[in-house]
């Protein structure tokens, strides 16, 4: 992404006969039996439907200690509204045809769609309906108001056909870290969900060539004020003691801000405080150190005296030297979404690596409790993006067409998101020289995200440096032919508590799949036999990684099959 990554081919592919046939059959296995264990069964450590499968010791340990387990993160509340399967269906308040849109494939409908979305925002939210057919868009479609959902007639019936890229529409976008890279290689979308004021300030900065930070506290990370300081607390706590609750109410969306100290003990803690963190050279990882303070959006659920209860357990310990505090933020998009459509970019060749023009798909930025459902992106440089987005759900999404740089990306401190029932199709044209394929990306201290029930006909589990931590990939079938990226100054590939659970690797390549030799305090559980070839990594930290490997060499044997679904049954 914003990185001096090694250039080269899209990665080796070997050992797979009739790739679509193998992956298609695996998809049936991968989606046939989710656990969804109720609390009593899950707590017992024996999920229903275990059948002939094997419950590993690690799962039994976890059920006794779900919120503070050393290797497995608690992600049972990831996703929109705590991962609720119930999807609200706001009433239709606007039809784009009433604002001038025509599904004839030739009329530029972007202005009409945006007028309808703005009208829905002024009405306080609701659904904006798109008709079946093909609607040409010559501009960015902007979902900029909370409670507004853009809904087509289904991904097989409604097509938005884009004609222009983000470099043309917004302007060239350089990297805040220097060099000649295009930030459209990892940012922005032709359907862009972001609060209006934040989007305006971001694009104005790009136009002025003042390359911005992209997250919750503005272009210079200075748009916040303290609501309360927080007393020391342990990871996994749901309730914290604060200095003052006069400005806190149930339902408030706040930021937990946690700063690093001169010895980088916060970064060491994110890596698990293992033996190698003390000798690791943090000071020269200037890109990584620019990512702190860690900013974690969360809703307040209860306020009693000076005790504040949160909707999710703390992601980290809170220590006095890290100056933990609850703060305001620059604004959020909440309760918004996109459903039932295909976004199709022109089928033009990919640009060289890190020089994307910005034929990008759907991006959620400074978004919370938002949802994308039944959406396909075709011929995109970058498919679906989470940029400083938290507690969002992407379900039934698909990346298809001529191939992409990042089919999915999750960066700039994105947390607690759920990407489920996703597909990365095999590319329809060969990869041009000097391009690179990643896969399902995570970076930039992003944490507690879940990728669940996926089929990847190409790509890899792209831990893209920037030390993401506590992320889960579960019940996924993958032809592991992509490569990870990441600048050396962005630091480690992995922080603590990465979990790869019930993974089928159809071409037998180990890289970024089996991570017990790479990722500190990690868990690799229920993966078939793999071997090292193509891109081969070494651990960032010396000494014992305290990683776990269980049920290695098995296929669909681990129970529960899906780590996220099983954790849904474990609550407070």
Positions of PLM-derived features:
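Right-handed parallel beta-helix
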Residues: 147, 156, 199-224, 260-287, 293, 301, 334-345, 368-379, ...
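Generic beta-strand/beta-sheet core signal
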Residues: 131, 153, 257, 311, ...
């Amino acid at each position: 992404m914003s990185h001096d990554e090694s250039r080269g081919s899209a990665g080796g592919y070997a050992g797979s006969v009739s790739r679509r046939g193998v992956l298609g059959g695996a998809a049936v296995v991968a989606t046939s039996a989710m656990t969804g264990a109720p609390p009593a069964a899950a707590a017992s450590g024996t999920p229903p439907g275990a059948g002939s499968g094997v419950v590993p010791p690690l799962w039994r340990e976890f059920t006794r200690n779900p919120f503070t387990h050393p290797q497995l993160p608690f992600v049972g509340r990831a996703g929109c509204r705590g991962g609720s399967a119930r999807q609200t269906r706001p009433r239709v308040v606007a039809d784009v045809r009433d604002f001038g849109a025509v599904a004839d494939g030739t009329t530029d409908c972007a202005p009409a769609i945006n007028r309808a979305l703005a009208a829905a925002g002024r009405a306080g939210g609701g659904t904006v309906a798109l008709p079946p057919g093909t609607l040409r868009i010559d501009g960015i479609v902007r979902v900029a108001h909370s409670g507004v959902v853009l809904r087509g007639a289904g991904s097989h019936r409604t097509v938005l056909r884009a004609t222009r890229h983000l470099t043309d529409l917004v302007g060239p976008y350089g990297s805040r870290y220097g060099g000649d890279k295009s930030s459209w290689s990892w940012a922005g979308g032709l359907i862009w969900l972001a609060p209006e004021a934040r989007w305006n300030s971001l694009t104005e900065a790009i136009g002025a060539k003042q390359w911005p930070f992209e997250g919750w506290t503005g272009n210079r990370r200075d748009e916040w004020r303290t609501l309360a300081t927080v007393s020391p607390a342990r990871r996994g706590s749901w309730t914290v003691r604060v200095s003052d609750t006069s400005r806190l109410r149930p339902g408030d969306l706040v930021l937990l801000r946690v700063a690093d100290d001169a010895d980088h003990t916060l970064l060491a803690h994110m890596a698990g405080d293992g033996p190698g963190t003390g000798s690791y050279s943090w000071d020269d990882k200037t890109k990584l150190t620019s990512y702190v303070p860690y900013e974690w959006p969360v809703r307040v659920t209860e306020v009693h005296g000076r005790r504040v209860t949160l909707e999710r357990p703390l992601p980290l310990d809170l220590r006095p030297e890290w100056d933990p505090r609850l703060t305001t933020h620059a604004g959020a998009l909440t309760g918004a979404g996109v459903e039932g459509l295909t976004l199709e970019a022109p089928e033009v060749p990919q640009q060289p690596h890190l020089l994307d023009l910005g034929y990008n798909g759907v991006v959620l930025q400074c978004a919370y409790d938002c949802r994308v459902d039944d959406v396909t992106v075709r011929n995109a440089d970058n498919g679906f993006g989470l940029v400083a987005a938290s507690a969002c759900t992407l379900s039934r999404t698909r990346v298809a067409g001529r191939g992409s740089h990042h089919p999915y990306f999750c960066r700039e401190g994105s947390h607690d998101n759920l990407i489920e029932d996703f597909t990365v199709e095999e590319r329809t044209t060969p990869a041009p020289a000097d391009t690179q394929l990643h896969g399902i990306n995570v970076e930039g201290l992003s944490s507690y995200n879940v990728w669940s029930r996926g089929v990847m006909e190409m790509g890899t589990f792209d831990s893209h440096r920037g030390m993401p931590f506590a992320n889960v990939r579960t019940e996924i079938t993958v032809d592991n032919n992509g490569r990870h990226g990441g600048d050396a100054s962005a630091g480690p590939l992995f922080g603590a508590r990465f979990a790869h659970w019930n993974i089928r690797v159809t071409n037998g390549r180990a890289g970024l799949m089996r991570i017990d030799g790479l990722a500190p305090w990690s868990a690799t559980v229920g993966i078939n036999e793999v071997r090292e070839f193509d891109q081969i990594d070494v651990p960032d930290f010396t000494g014992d990684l305290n990683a776990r490997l269980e049920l290695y060499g098995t296929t669909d044997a681990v129970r529960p099959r899906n780590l996220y679904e099983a954790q849904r049954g474990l609550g407070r």
